[in-house]
From Swiss-Prot:
Extra remark beyond the main annotation: Highly homologous to GCUD2 but localized to a distinct locus.
GO annotations of cellular component type: cytosol; intracellular membrane-bounded organelle
Similarity comment text for this entry: Belongs to the FAM72 family.
Lineage: superkingdom: Eukaryota
Lineage of origin: Eukaryota, Metazoa, Chordata, Craniata, Vertebrata
Gene: FAM72B
A Pfam family matched in the record: YPEH2ZP
Organism of origin: Homo sapiens
Name by which UniProt lists this protein: Protein FAM72B
Length: 149
């Protein structure tokens, strides 16, 4: 997906947790909207979530666009929490987008604003280090209380 048209560096980074079981799914979440229908709010991430979600079901296409999608489910509780864009379609690819292919339904996850290294300011995408995704709570330094709030 193209990111040269729009800038997302001032967007807040979120920790995404499953609403059903409170499992941390990603430490690199961003609030987003569906390209094909901007009335639909979502969350997205740029790195495949490891040890948190897995594919479920078959690939499918929507009526709105021709992107090839596959649902993802929380590994802890099994509920579908979003989908992965396997192949973006020719109409979505050139659109203003954040380049993320991992999408989370706002009805299935909740977000917690991630703080920067000072622990005071909200971390912005422009300041986010490019590291490999991990959902290990020790690595993320997230307390259970913070994820439950």
């Amino acid at each position: 997906m193209s990111t040269n048209i729009c800038s997302f560096k001032d967007r807040c980074v979120s920790i995404l947790c499953c609403k059903f079981c409170k499992q941390v799914l990603s430490s690199r979440g961003m609030k987003a909207v569906l390209l094909a229908d901007t009335e639909i709010d979502l969350f997205s991430t740029d790195i495949p979530p490891t040890n948190a979600v897995d594919f479920t079901g078959r690939c499918y296409f929507t009526k709105i666009c021709k992107c090839k999608l596959k649902d993802i489910a929380c590994l802890k509780c099994g509920n579908i929490v979003g989908y992965h864009v396997i192949v973006p379609c020719s109409s979505c690819l050139p659109s203003c987008n954040n380049g993320h292919f991992w999408m989370f339904h706002s009805q299935a996850v909740y977000d917690i604003n991630r703080l920067d290294s000072t622990g005071v300011n909200i971390l912005l995408w422009g300041n986010l280090p490019e590291i490999e995704e991990s959902t290990d709570e020790d690595v993320l330094n997230i307390s259970a209380e913070e994820c439950i709030r």
